[in-house]
Every structure is written in C-alpha cells, then in structure tokens.
Amino acid sequence: SPSNSKCPDGPDCFVGLM
C-alpha cells in the first residue's frame, strides 16, 4: 500500500489516488 497515511489499504485507496 502507498506510504500516504491518508490512503487506507484497499481499492478505495487506488480510487482516491485517481
């Protein structure tokens, strides 16, 4: 998972990055 603490583990994380 990304080092971004604001980004939770899981598909939602990738959606947020996009």
UniProtKB/Swiss-Prot annotation:
User: Which InterPro entries does the record associate with it?
Assistant: Tachy_Neuro_lke_CS
Q: Give the record's GO CC terms.
A: extracellular region
Q: Any S-S bridges, and between which cysteines?
A: 7-13
Picking any one GO biological process from the record gives:
neuropeptide signaling pathway
Q: Which domain of life is it from?
A: Eukaryota
Modification Methionine amide occurs at = 18
Compartments where located: Secreted
The record's keywords, sorted A to Z, are: Amidation, Disulfide bond, Neuropeptide, Secreted
Major localization class: secreted
In which family does this protein belong, per the annotation? Answer: Belongs to the tachykinin family.
- What function is annotated for this protein? Tachykinins are active peptides which excite neurons, evoke behavioral responses, are potent vasodilators and secretagogues, and contract (directly or indirectly) many smooth muscles.
Give the protein name, as stated in the record: Scyliorhinin-2
Q: Which organism is it from?
A: Scyliorhinus canicula
Instruction: List the lineage, top down.
Output: Eukaryota, Metazoa, Chordata, Craniata, Vertebrata
